[in-house]
Amino acid sequence: MLAQLFEQLFQSIDSTLITNIFIWAVIFVFLSAWWCDKKNIHSKFREYAPTLMGALGILGTFIGIIIGLLNFNTESIDTSIPVLLGGLKTAFITSIVGMFFAILFNGMDAFFFANKRSALAENNPESVTPEHIYHELKEQNQTLTKLVSGINGDSEGSLIAQIKLLRTEISDSSQAQLANHTHFSNKLWEQLEQFADLMAKGATEQIIDALRQVIIDFNENLTEQFGENFKALDASVKKLVEWQGNYKTQIEQMSEQYQQSVESLVETKTAVAGIWEECKEIPLAMSELREVLQVNQHQISELSRHLETFVAIRDKATTVLPEIQNKMAEVGELLKSGAANVSASLEQTSQQILLNADSMRVALDEGTEGFRQSVTQTQQAFASMAHDVSNSSETLTSTLGETITEMKQSGEEFLKSLESHSKELHRNMEQNTTNVIDMFSKTGEKINHQLSSNADNMFDSIQTSFDKAGAGLTSQVRESIEKFALSINEQLHAFEQATEREMNREMQSLGNALLSISKGFVGNYEKLIKDYQIVMGQLQALISANKHRG
């Protein structure tokens, strides 16, 4: 029963599969045994591994033979021979692999791991016996005996003998080295002394020769250079003296020109004061005009009083007609004389205003011309000053040029401002005067026309006409005079402020320019004096040094 079961099992198994299984089994056993041998573990398995691999090889051999024999059929030899050969192939391969790995493992164990196991066994015996202790003590005794004989022995190879020899050699070597060092030091000192003598001698001679040549060249160059330098210095000192004289002259000229500028500014101030005095006469003329207007107002009041009388007379006209006619004649004469007086007063007032305007225009023209002349003189003085100073220094020329340009521009601006203010004042005065004259003329003509046209019906409209004429004349004259006075006062105030502002600005700019010029002169003079002192100090030092050498 079991035999048939095994036969069926082996007949169904492929020989190649059995071969691979046994080969992998042998390889696994080999690697496991090698790992245990390397780590020194599982010693029993390590010892049994070669036998196990051989047994697996033999087992594979018999299984291969059985597979070949069981599948061999005598009736069909052709088909049975390949199966038989496959079983034999499995038998031989498994046996060869098993024996090969067993032999390989035994060889590796003998060559690589046996010595290691022996050393470990000696170092770590499983049990220590008295024999081991005796053996160790005996070895230690032998070692100590050899050590003592090596230290205290009489032979030359002992340690004490070697130390004695070494000490003798060290003493001899130190004495020889000391002798050599002494000899070398003496010889080196002699060579250094010889070298120092040679160096001192050669260096002294070369230094003396070099100094002699340098002194000769220095004396020659000093004679040549200082002759020319003294000549140039003499000429420079002469030019400096001449420049100082010219500078003094220019300073005096600048002082004179500055004085002329101050005088011209004083004259300008006087002219402006004259203009101011002339302008002060305008309120006086206005006061006279006020008196004339008061006279006219008085005449108008007289006319009103006469008109009131005429009203009273008109009430009595029915009874006293002849008296009315006589009174009318008297009133007509009075009206004619009043109109004539008003016309004469208006003409006189207009003439006075024209005269005052002409005198004011003349005064303004004269003041403007005087101020223009003074500014022109100032410009000419500063122009000549700039021309003189430009010959002495380029820096001074540029400074004065800028100053003169600024003063010229400011002077021109002041002249333009003064001329514009004067023209505007003159134009306003002429316009106001013309307006007043026209207004007075028109008013007078209107009054005369009204008087002449209303003479026939004066009993009806003379009171109304004279009231309107008086009120219109009074208001217009008052408004015109007030406007004229305000305009004159504003223009005079503006003219005064502009003049004062321009004068202050011009004087300030002039003072700043003169101050900068003076500072420039002082700085240049101080710099020149310092340079002169430096040159003289250097020259004196060179002369004293030359004297000491001589």
UniProtKB/Swiss-Prot annotation:
SS bond list: none
GO cellular component, one term: plasma membrane
Compartments it resides in: Cell inner membrane
Transmembrane spans: 16-36, 52-72, 92-112
Record's keyword terms, sorted: Antiviral defense, Cell inner membrane, Cell membrane, Membrane, Transmembrane, Transmembrane helix
One GO process term, biological-process aspect: defense response to virus
The keyword Repressor is annotated on this UniProt entry: no
InterPro entries to which the protein is assigned, alphabetical: MotA_ExbB_proton_chnl, ZorA-like_t2
A Pfam match: MotA_ExbB
Membrane-topology descriptor: Multi-pass membrane protein
UniProt-listed Gene3D superfamilies: Apolipoprotein (1.20.120.20)
Family: Belongs to the MotA family.
Functional note: Component of antiviral defense system Zorya type II, composed of ZorA, ZorB and ZorE. Expression of Zorya type II in E.coli (strain MG1655) confers resistance to phages SECphi7 and T7. While most T7 infected Zorya-containing cells undergo abortive infection, a minority produce viable phage progeny. These eventually accumulate to a high multiplicity of infection, leading to culture collapse by 170 minutes after initial infection. ZorA and ZorB probably assemble in the cell inner membrane and exert their effect there.
Name listed for the protein in its UniProt record: Zorya protein ZorA
Species of origin: Escherichia coli (strain ATCC 8739 / DSM 1576 / NBRC 3972 / NCIMB 8545 / WDCM 00012 / Crooks)
